């Protein structure tokens, strides 16, 4: 049995994540977008439409080409705003880091279960 306290390590990981460059960039980019209520509103509307689109895809519903085109155009339009484009870049980098960490943990757990 190891003397390692998993909860202490989890807190250590959480601190490391919140001090990481991807996390800090994401927080800063989010603050920049939130300074402008119109940008925040546009971003929330886009997220809502993306969620509806994803839900329809998961349920296997037919999605009209027009809907796909409208969503793509809406994303392209909102991405013209530098602060929002930076937010998307920062969010993508943070999510990638977070997913990588989850994958590392999952692989370690799976290999332990296989032993």
From Swiss-Prot:
Task: Name the source organism.
Answer: Syntrophomonas wolfei subsp. wolfei (strain DSM 2245B / Goettingen)
Q: Which domain of life, per UniProt?
A: Bacteria
Q: Note the InterPro entries from the entry.
A: Com_YlbF, YheA/YmcA-like_dom_sf
- Family assignment from sequence similarity: Belongs to the UPF0342 family.
**How is this protein named in the record?**
UPF0342 protein Swol_0655
């Amino acid at each position: 049995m190891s003397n390692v306290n998993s909860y202490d390590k989890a807190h250590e990981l959480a601190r490391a994540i919140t001090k990481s460059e991807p996390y800090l960039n994401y927080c800063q980019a989010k603050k920049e977008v939130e300074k402008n209520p119109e940008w925040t509103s546009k971003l929330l509307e886009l997220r809502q439409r993306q969620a509806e689109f994803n839900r329809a895809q998961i349920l296997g519903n037919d999605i009209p080409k027009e809907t796909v085109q409208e969503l793509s155009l809406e994303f392209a339009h909102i991405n013209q705003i530098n602060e929002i484009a930076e937010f998307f870049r920062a969010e993508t980098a943070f999510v990638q880091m977070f997913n990588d960490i989850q994958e590392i943990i999952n692989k370690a757990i799976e290999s332990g279960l296989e032993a």
